[in-house]
UniProtKB/Swiss-Prot annotation:
Belongs to the OSBP family. One of its GO terms (molecular function) is lipid binding. Keywords: Lipid transport, Lipid-binding, Transport. The keyword Membrane does not apply. Coiled coil: none annotated. This is Oxysterol-binding protein-related protein 1B.
């Protein structure tokens, strides 16, 4: 039997090794005791005879084999991504080993790894033919057929920005250890990482109904997220997330303009991150544009200046460089971290769709560069929507989950569900029906309608979570939740 070590990273007393065995991918976690190292094989698809060979192979390397992981921790047949092992880090001797292994104790949760196969063949419809009469208008108010959507709502897209939430876990831990410079660097990497999933994504998310919600209970990431559409005109979505050592919240009013060959999206809103020790950090997103609406390949770009600041020791300024037509090195992000005296103490550089690095600056001299964040590997066979592995999980609806959700959750939206299954005609029919209902939303708002789970802060236009959602979920009481999607015909 062939067996070889693909990679081995040492984290203090812990070792994580990936072994390839025949046609099976076996991920093994080595945990070192005082006098021995134990080996756990987590691929339950591996035949028993191969497991015996793995045992011999491991013992030959000087390790003691201890068997497989329990079913609760067994990975999917495709095998987990390498990032499950390293938490996004490459080997770096300057990084505390215990920081790298944050999140290893989170439970594994089996989630789907592909969308359903489409039932119907999709129609070819020109985007230009649908929007050519709306030059200069706000496209959030333009109704498009379901063919131009992706099977996610704007509420779910808010959660997608938290794909690399481990960076905030690490930021929390750095702060606990008194290293607030590494904290702000990890926060900056997180602020950039949310854009990585947009590469190749040209379809529009569904505009939520007034009062529509979305929950994401992800113990495998150590967090719980909740969002709600709190206003129809202007269109505002608000979110709140409880993480491990931190809380994150914000609202977003997205202004869009169509300029003929491109669409410009300007986010209006403030994102707030609060650590358990009281430090608060805030920033706003940069401008996004989608190009080549008439001719050529559609692509998106993000550009502008992002300021990350709060009540801590450091602030960060990131510059997202605008892509030019002849740019051979697009998507660049550069930034600096300053102390309270305005002195530059670190620099950042990278690309929003690849990775971010940092260098320390001391008396004008720069250290070697170190990796902060690296994008997860894309799918080998992506769908037309170019969703990431994480993105594919966002609209998953299991029977058990369906029983617990309120009637306002995005997963229950019929046009979005039909689109995901590739039932385009039914999806379009339902989208038209719901848009008819949505036209009543402004009247509701004018009559004094208020969000169920969020309210404006006193003296501010910012929406904050008022609590109660997870308690209602635990009790199964959704009496205050309207049937916003109505009867499905």
């Amino acid at each position: 039997m062939e067996a070889r070590v693909i990679s081995c990273t040492t984290f203090g007393d812990n070792k994580v090794v990936k072994i390839a065995v025949l046609n099976h991918q076996a991920i093994t976690k080595y945990k070192a005791g005082e006098n021995e190292t134990t080996v756990v094989v987590s691929d339950d698809t591996c035949p028993e005879k191969d497991v015996k060979e793995i045992k011999k192979f491991c013992e030959k390397l000087g390790y003691v084999y201890e068997g497989r992981l329990s079913e609760e921790y067994t990975q999917t047949n495709t095998g987990p991504d390498d990032d499950w092992i390293t938490n996004g880090f490459e080997s770096d001797d300057d990084v505390d080993p215990s920081i790298k292994t944050i999140g290893f104790n989170y439970p594994h949760v089996n989630r789907r790894n592909k969308l359903p196969d489409p039932v119907e063949k999709e129609k070819s419809v020109s985007l230009w033919s649908m929007i050519k009469d709306n030059i200069g208008k706000d496209l959030t108010k333009v109704c498009l057929p379901v063919y131009f959507n992706e099977p996610l709502s704007s509420l779910q897209k808010c959660f997608e920005d938290l794909e690399y939430s481990y960076l905030l876990d690490q930021a929390s831990e750095w702060g606990k250890r008194g290293n607030n410079l590494m904290r702000i660097l990890n926060v900056a990497a997180f602020a950039v990482s949310g854009y990585a999933s947009t590469k190749g994504r040209i379809c529009k998310p569904f505009n939520p109904m007034l009062g529509e919600t979305y929950e994401a209970d992800y113990p495998d990431k150590g967090l719980r997220f909740f969002s709600e559409k709190v206003s129809h005109h202007p269109m505002i979505v608000a979110c709140h997330c409880d993480g491990t050592g931190w809380k994150f919240w914000g609202d977003s009013n997205l202004k869009s303009k169509f300029w003929g060959r491109s669409i410009q999206l300007d986010p209006i809103g403030l994102l707030t991150l609060q650590f358990d020790d009281g430090e608060i950090v805030q920033w706003s997103k940069v401008t996004t544009s989608i190009y080549n609406l008439i001719l050529g390949k559609l692509y998106c770009d993000h550009y502008g200046t992002m300021l990350i600041e709060g009540n801590g020791e450091y602030s960060c300024k990131l510059k997202f460089k605008k892509q030019s037509m002849m740019d051979r090195n697009p998507h660049q992000v550069q930034g600096i971290v300053e102390d309270k005296n305005g002195k530059t103490v670190a620099k950042l550089f990278g690309k929003w769709d690849e990775s971010m690095y940092y260098v320390m600056v001391n008396q004008g001299k720069e250290s070697e560069s170190h990796l902060l964040w690296k994008r997860n590997k894309p799918l080998e066979n992506p769908t037309k929507y170019n969703l990431t592995r994480f993105g594919i999980t966002l609209n998953e609806l299991t029977p058990d989950l369906k029983e617990m959700l309120p009637p306002t959750d995005s997963r229950l939206r019929p046009d979005q569900r039909y689109l995901e299954k590739g039932e385009f005609e039914m999806g379009n029919r339902e989208k038209l029906r719901l848009e008819q209902r949505q036209r009543q939303a402004r009247e509701k708002q004018e009559r004094g309608w208020k969000p169920t789970w969020f309210s404006k802060e006193k003296g501010s236009e910012t929406y904050r979570y008022i609590g109660g959602y997870w308690e209602a979920r635990d009790s199964g009481r959704w009496d205050d939740c309207p049937d916003i999607f109505g009867q499905v015909h």
